[in-house]
């Protein structure tokens, strides 16, 4: 993957979403790319993830999103209209990954808090999960991803580690709503999951292309243990 080109494509899509009144008012930016662009995480991120405003018309949103893809000459390879999930392909040199995933989730969490943030990279403002909400959802992500997809993602552990190092606040209500557990009970469950399922191989496979070489080699041996200590 050409990281600079991929980042440029993401910025173009985000700029057009911000300039579309309907999308900007009904799609709320979240996830790793959002955290990276706001300076909360120091890694590369490859997908665009959003929450959808309650009561929004998914068909209308789908139409507006596809207009942006057409405008930017992005070919839709995979489309799940009922889930508002898209994989689009952009032009690049041969033999390089050149796909971007855009996901708009309608699995609403009433405890999520959203606010507008200015994104200097694109000179636009987007409504996003606020920082405590983002951290809470990061903590829920490892078990939620494994439950839905049977996948263990090293980036989930890295993000939790980085958020703890920065001493970011946590919206405990999100954890309670999404897991049905109080904070301490959920953290106990998360610790057991990490101890059992996160391996050095998991970390290496997921993070080697998301971190620069120096940072990757510095963190890979200690990430699991340090994260468990934080928890």
Predicted stretch roles:
Residues 1-27, 38-41, 53-231:
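Structured mid-to-C-terminal alpha-helical surface segments
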Residues 29-34:
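Glycine-rich beta-strand-to-loop/alpha-helix junction loops that act as flexible
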Residues 50:
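Structural signature of FAD isoalloxazine-binding scaffolds in flavoprotein oxidoreductases
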């Amino acid at each position: 993957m050409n990281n600079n080109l991929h980042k440029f494509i993401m910025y173009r899509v985000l700029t057009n979403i911000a300039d579309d009144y309907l999308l900007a008012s009904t799609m709320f930016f979240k996830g790793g790319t959002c955290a990276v662009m706001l300076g909360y995480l120091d890694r590369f991120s490859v997908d665009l993830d959003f929450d959808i405003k309650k009561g929004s018309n998914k068909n209308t949103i789908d139409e507006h999103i596809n207009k942006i893809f057409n405008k930017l000459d992005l070919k839709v390879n995979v489309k799940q209209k009922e889930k508002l999930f898209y994989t689009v392909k952009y032009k690049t040199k041969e033999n390089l990954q050149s796909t971007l995933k855009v996901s708009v989730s309608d699995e609403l969490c009433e405890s999520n808090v959203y606010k507008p943030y200015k994104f200097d990279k694109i000179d636009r403002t987007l409504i996003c999960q606020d920082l405590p909400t983002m951290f809470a959802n990061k903590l829920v992500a490892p078990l939620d991803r494994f439950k839905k997809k049977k996948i263990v993602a090293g980036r989930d552990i890295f993000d939790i580690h980085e958020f703890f190092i920065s001493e970011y606040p946590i919206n405990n209500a999100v954890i309670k709503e999404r897991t049905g557990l109080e904070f301490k009970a959920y953290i106990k469950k998360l610790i057991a999951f990490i101890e059992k399922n996160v391996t050095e191989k998991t970390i290496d496979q997921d993070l080697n292309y998301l971190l620069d070489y120096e940072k990757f080699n510095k963190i890979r041996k200690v990430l699991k243990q340090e994260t468990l200590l934080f928890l």
